[in-house]
Each structure stands twice: as C-alpha cells, then as structure tokens.
Design a protein with these regions (language model features):
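Short Gly/aromatic-enriched secondary-structure transition segments
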Residues: 59-71
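N-terminal post-signal-peptidase region of extra-cytosolic proteins
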Residues: 27-42, 68-92, 102, 106, ...
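Short, surface-exposed binding/anchoring microloops in extracellular/periplasmic proteins
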Residues: 45
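Bacterial Sec-dependent signal peptides at the C-terminal "C-region" and cleavage site
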Residues: 10-33
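Bacterial N-terminal signal peptides that target proteins for export
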Residues: 1-11
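Exported/periplasmic cell-wall-interacting domains
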Residues: 39, 82, 92-172
Length: 172
C-alpha cells in the first residue's frame, strides 16, 4: 500500500495546531471563561448571553436561558425597566400569584442608595401565569427589570439553590 502524498504545507499546519495546544482534547471556544467565581456559591447572570448559572465552588451546576429588563442593563431609578448590574444578596423565595415563584434580589445596595439609585421589587421569576406560549418567555427581553426563566421548573431549581446555598447574585 502506498501512503498518500502529504504536502509540506499540510504538515506545517498540523504542527502549528499541535504547538498551539490543539489535539490535546477539545479546544475551549474563543473567549471562554468560567462563569463562576472560584469560591463560594453564586447565581451568575450574564446579560450578553442571556444565561444564568448556578455556581458552587467555581463549578457551574446549571445553565438557564433568561430574559432581562426591556430597558437594558444598568438600573439606576425606579421605572426605568432596566436590570441592575452588580453583586446582591437574595431575599427568601416566595409564592407569587403572577409568576408562581419569586426570588427577591436585594436591590439597591446601601452603596447604590447613597448614589441615588432607586427601585424595588426586583428578582428572579418564571413566566407569567397567563402566558399560553411559555417558550416565548426567554425569546426577548420583556420584564420591567427582573430576570425571568423560561419555565416554572427552572425558577424552582433556582429557588431551591437559593434556599440551600445562600448564594450571592452576580449580574453583569
């Protein structure tokens, strides 16, 4: 059997890929970074990708697609329909007639209040009770500043995590 001819160019390209670390398992996607802080528990929300991660000791345990405030990010005043950015503690998850389960986020922080930020009743919840097409719950940003999961099961999973872990909310 005759070995197929391989061009010098192909060999050099293969060597360059090996030298760059390819071929040693799957490469990380360009720009990948671990979404979780190295220690502790956190619910990390990334506005750019519309993803929420449940994190424990630097390891993501769940990834959930979310919708955000229709006014964008960077809440500063009540009624601006923006989702706040920063680190927050959680209140106790509770039943909600409108959303099933509501997980309060302690916004604004004392520092934000000192800077004049206003707003209240922000948190994580599922789709509204009256929506027929829950698949649309994360298709676009529709909330008045909250973070919305696509299903009741997802918000319940977040609520259990908040009750069990007492995590920090990190929103960016």
């Amino acid at each position: 059997m005759v070995a197929p001819a391989v061009s010098t160019r192909a060999v050099l390209a293969a060597l360059a890929l090996l030298a760059a670390g390819f071929g040693e398992g799957p490469p990380d996607p360009a720009g990948y970074r671990n979404p979780c802080p190295a220690t502790g528990s956190a619910v990390a929300v990334f506005s750019r990708t519309h993803e929420l991660y449940l994190c424990r000791e630097g390891v993501p345990h769940a990834r959930i697609r979310v919708a955000l405030g229709r006014g964008g990010m960077g809440k500063r005043r009540a009624g601006d329909k923006k989702t706040p950015v920063g680190s927050y503690s959680f209140g106790e998850p509770r039943a909600s007639a409108r959303y099933g389960t509501f997980i309060p986020i302690d916004y604004p922080t004392a520092e934000q209040t000192a800077l004049g930020y206003t707003g209240r009743d922000l948190g994580i919840h599922g789709p509204p009770r009256n929506w027929k097409d829950v698949a649309a719950a994360t298709a676009l940003d529709w909330t008045t500043g909250c973070i919305a999961t696509g299903t009741d099961e997802e918000v319940e999973r977040v609520a259990r995590f908040v009750r069990d872990e007492r995590p920090l909310a990190i929103i960016e």
